[in-house]
Amino acid sequence: PWSREKMARLVAGLKAAGVHTIGFDVAFTEPERNVAQELIEATAGEGDSAYTDYLTQRVPDMDRDLAFSKQLKGQNVVLGFLFHAIEQEPAGRLPSAWSFVPEEQADTLTVPTMASFTGNLKVLQSAARYGGFLNTTPDADGVIRSTPLVLRNGNMVYPALSLAMLRRYINAKRFKLETAEVGATVA
């Protein structure tokens, strides 16, 4: 996998090239290793306080997640995340949900409900602000022929990564969601 430092350089390069909207079809669920922090832990109790103090000062400089988050902040970047159909402990952070209908009316939508999620690290999702789910379900023969544009978690509705990127690209403030028993359309 690419380091978060490389991802930060990628975002900076794409923005410099004039790219309007960037989407990551991966979820950043775990922090990247911080070498300075690992050295502090590995040398704990060895008695070299000057070395430990030096490493402690370097911990923020070696925080690649923080560096990546600074590059995401204020940009049209959409991060991917995953929903789960079975109940499990939620992990990470979800982006803000879309307000298609008032929260108390969400149960009336014929939108598939997901039981749990694996979101991004808080530092990254807070910086990116936008997100879209990555879920797909292949047909019995293993081919993916369709994918939902929206899914629900609790009383909140979330977009697929593709729809979230489209919304950022065209700077749409609102989407209209029309659902039916057999499917849904977004206009």
Positions of the model-derived regions?
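Non-transmembrane functional regions of envelope-associated proteins
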Residues: P1-A187
